[in-house]
Amino acid sequence: MFWLGKDSKVFRFPLSFFHFPLLPDFKIAYDEIIFCAKLGSESGAYLAYVRNSISDDSCKKNSSERFFYYLCGIMEQVRAKKALGQHFLTDLNIAQKICNSLSGGSAENPDNVLEVGCGMGVLTQYLLRRDDIVTYGVDIDTESIAYLHAHYPDFTPRLREGDFLKMDLAEYFPNGVKVIGNFPYNISSQIFFKIIEHRNLIPESVGMIQKEVAERIAEKEGSKTYGILSVLLQAWYDIEYLFTVSEKVFNPPPKVKSAVIRLRRNNTEKLDCDEQLFVKVVKASFGQRRKMLRNSLRSAFGDFHGAEHPFFTKRAEQLSVADFVELTKWVSDNR
């Protein structure tokens, strides 16, 4: 059994009592559900135990637990999990503003959009109302997936339970996809590295992240916060810092302010250098950002046969994207 809350009353219902679809991958016939709800609770505390014909205890426990989370879909809210970096947006005006920040196609030729971390669908509901986009979703949280299945049944065929960072975007979206979301704080940087990796598939992204990360991404050379993500994203995308979001509009509230930024792929189809080497040069340069580039790059690529570049007396934060392109070409010729 799985308990949530106290002071509950127990009811027994046949499975046919519940008028919502089962998850598409359920293979088990459930005979009866013992359902326990805390009456009068705004959040709705639930207990669910699934009785079926499976004899293997471990299989029964796993299947029961999954169905329990599915039942949680009729709860008023999903529990935010610190381990997943979840801070659920509660302000509908902010959600609509984020939705409106993403460009679309047309009703006749809508763009594919992937929402990363759908949570309880606060942003999802506005995306689904647009006829110039087709919205897909991915979320690693079983409880959130259950909630979305129950509250947005028409969204179910386009909703995937899984890790965006491990998702094969080329397989699911061979013609490209725009990415949007209230990105989980603990993987926001990793999400942007994945966008860089799949830049040929992702023409645009709108994301809500920590304010300090957003500022760092939009920063120009010469600043102490200018770093790897700044250079790599600005090499292929135009960055717009759209607006700041108060910590008070989240549940639970984070300890820092958030911000929404927009990335739109620029006209640079290909850099005028080896792009894989460009990424390595940028990462190596900022790997020891307090040192001059001479030391940082020689640690990564060798002594360049004694050759020197004028940039060697500078630090990584002093170089623009164009400077890094030039430096990459030099490294390619001299290593």
Region spans (language model):
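C-terminal lobe and adjacent flexible extensions of AdoMet/dcAdoMet transferase-like proteins
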Residues: 284-335
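Polybasic, lysine-rich low-complexity intrinsically disordered segments
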Residues: 28, 33, 52, 61-62
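Positively charged N-terminal leader segments that act as targeting/secretion signals
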Residues: 6-13, 39-41, 58-67
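Catalytic cores of RNA-modifying enzymes
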Residues: 66-284, 322-329
